[in-house]
UniProtKB/Swiss-Prot annotation:
Species whose genome carries this gene: Streptococcus pneumoniae (strain ATCC BAA-255 / R6)
Protein name per Swiss-Prot or TrEMBL: Rqc2 homolog RqcH
Function of the molecule: Key component of the ribosome quality control system (RQC), a ribosome-associated complex that mediates the extraction of incompletely synthesized nascent chains from stalled ribosomes and their subsequent degradation. RqcH recruits Ala-charged tRNA, and with RqcP directs the elongation of stalled nascent chains on 50S ribosomal subunits, leading to non-templated C-terminal alanine extensions (Ala tail). The Ala tail promotes nascent chain degradation. May add between 1 and at least 8 Ala residues. Binds to stalled 50S ribosomal subunits. Recombinant protein binds to immobilized human fibronectin; binding is saturable and competed by heparin. Recombinant protein inhibits binding of whole cells to fibronectin.
Record's subunit section: Associates with stalled 50S ribosomal subunits, binds to RqcP. Interacts with human fibronectin.
Family from the record: Belongs to the NEMF family.
Length: 551
């Protein structure tokens, strides 16, 4: 979900309990649009992160350590002047909007009492962090300067009077009176889109969840939703302050820890995406090209359906050769295949026998085309399957795995090796410890590793696992030739997790002995065929997978 007003409401409550009456000890700006305050509160030190990033804007406590620039910016120098040693008096969310105001008190150089408000506006590309004088509402400094030419509604420059962002007529879902709420719930269309316009601070996911629950007892359902306790929940791709329906996620003790984990993982994913962008683009282009090629080949194969018709016409002309006239462009003969008369087109320049041979040649040509096209289609389908497997691996790869996937694409001829580019050393296969505490399970994280694991490392009697009919890793239970059902389930869950079905609630996984696997001649790396497998059904669990991994 997005960092919406609903999420912000919960995190402000968390920050208020931790930081109010604390003192600001240090102020740093590790990145251009981010600010970190070190605060001493309740005999503990906390790091408060405020981010005006256009995509990752947020406010949270963080355990992450940052490297600070050697030379502080003007913004930081002004903040240190007003905030160093300041007491945090309050932390408030403006209505249910994505604006937080932190009021602090301090003493200036001559000992006079002063108050200031540190404001963070989390509004996408318009996100900002401002320090405002409490009494005069004058802006003391702002992390992003916005002049009149950029925004005619309000100027965000030092010395300007602070004007809040324009408000809408939408209502605060946390403070709305029962009478007004009852009227809305009875008279308005309660779709997610309409709920977003009626109430402040609802992101798409929050609005979708609210629409889902507003079916019966709407007033109490609404109140219960907005009054529920914070129970942070992290999924593979999102986060929420409370668990949403159909959202199997990992619980967290607090929202700040959840955000630390989410943004650390997201930063890793973004770095991987950046590093892998060339490979992803190349694979997507090759997939598109091969899918287009497959459609064309299938159309051409469809056009060969009349091959049998040519053979039959050749046979009929041969059988009734004496009835076929010269110098005619057609003849009608009895068709003993259908017991109906048939008209056969002729070439007047040819003899009856030559016309028959012409039909046989056309039949033979189409017959050869069928075999040729069938082989081509199988080859193209295999290429598409291979590229889909690479695409799956790329989407799940870490930074250290990108180079090995590139090497694989070089070896399979999809990209060229750069000048002076070294051949990548093969990374060791990942090992996981099964629930019995002793069995090792190997996982191939790309097709070269899959090939090595299945056809070089694994013993014939060992069990092999793969997600059914979708791209994924090869998984082998090593050494244990009679594994328990629990160990088999562990291996199946690994195969499900490292597959295209990672985010599914239920994944089918094939299990078979290595000796029953077949590597087709000329097949792409990691491609196998098999029959006689058993199929398990499991649910991928990221937390369990992480706990199984051997360091």
């Amino acid at each position: 979900m997005s960092f919406d007003g609903f999420f912000l409401h919960h995190i402000v409550e968390e920050l208020r309990s931790e930081l109010v009456n604390g003192r600001i000890q240090k102020i740093n700006q590790p990145f251009e649009q981010e600010l970190v305050l070190q605060i001493r509160s309740n005999r503990q030190s906390h790091r408060l992160l405020l981010s005006a990033h256009p995509v990752f804007g947020r406010i949270q406590l963080t355990q992450t350590t940052f490297e600070n620039p050697a030379q502080p910016s003007t913004f930081i120098m002004v903040l240190r002047k007003y905030l160093q040693g300041a007491l945090i008096e309050s932390i408030e969310q403006v209505e249910n909007d994505r604006i937080v105001e932190m009021t602090v008190s301090n003493k200036n150089e001559i000992g006079d009492h002063i108050q200031a408000t540190l404001i963070i506006e989390i509004m996408g590309k318009h996100s900002n962090i401002l320090l405002v004088d409490k009494s005069s509402h004058k802006i003391l400094e702002v992390i992003k300067h916005v002049g009149f030419s950029q925004n005619s509604y309000r100027t965000l420059l030092p010395g300007s009077t602070y004007i809040a962002p324009p408000s809408t007529e939408s209502l605060n879902p946390f403070t709305i009176k029962d009478e007004k709420l009852f009227e809305i719930l009875q008279t308005q269309e309660l779709t997610a889109k309409n709920l977003q316009s009626l109430f402040q601070g609802l992101g798409r996911d929050t609005a979708n969840e609210l629409e889902r629950i507003l079916v019966s007892e709407k007033l109490s359902a609404f109140r219960n939703f907005f009054n529920q306790e914070t129970k942070p929940c992290l999924t593979e791709t999102s986060f929420s302050p409370v668990p949403f329906a159909n959202q199997a996620g990992e619980p967290f003790a607090n929202l700040s820890d959840l955000l630390d984990t989410y943004y650390k993982n997201k930063a890793e994913r973004d770095r991987v995406k950046q590093q892998a962008s060339e490979l992803i683009r190349r694979v997507e282009n090759e997939l598109q090209k091969n899918r287009h090629k497959l459609k064309k080949q299938e159309r051409e194969l469809l056009a060969t359906d009349n091959a049998e018709e040519f053979r039959q016409k050749g046979e009929l002309l041969t059988t009734f050769l004496h009835q076929v006239p010269n110098d005619q462009d057609q003849v009608i003969l009895d068709n003993y295949y259908t017991n109906q008369p048939i008209m056969i087109a002729l070439d007047k320049a040819l003899t009856p026998n030559q016309n028959a041979q012409r039909y046989f040649k056309r039949y033979q040509k189409l017959k050869e085309a069928v075999k040729y096209l069938t082989d081509l289609i199988e080859e193209t389908k295999a290429t598409i399957l291979y590229l889909e497997s690479v695409e799956t691996v790329l989407n799940q790869a870490g930074l250290e795995e990108i180079a090995e996937i590139r090497e694989e694409l070089i070896q399979t001829g999809f990209i060229r090796r750069r000048q002076r580019e070294k051949i990548q050393k093969r990374k060791k296969l990942e090992q996981y410890l099964a629930s019995d505490g002793k069995t090792i399970i190997y996982v191939g994280r790309n097709n070269l590793q899959n090939e090595e694991l299945t056809f070089k490392m694994a013993r014939k009697e060992e069990l092999w696992f793969h997600a059914k009919d979708i791209p994924g890793s090869h998984v082998v239970i090593s050494g244990n030739l009679d594994p328990s059902d629990a160990v088999k389930t562990d291996a199946a869950e690994l195969a499900a997790y490292f597959s295209q079905g990672r985010l599914s609630n239920l994944v089918q996984v094939d299990m078979i002995e290595v000796k029953k696997l077949n590597k087709p001649t000329g097949g792409k790396p990691g491609f196998v065929t098999y029959t006689g497998q058993k199929t398990l059904r499991v649910t991928p669990d990221s937390k369990k997978i992480a706990s199984m991994k051997k360091s």
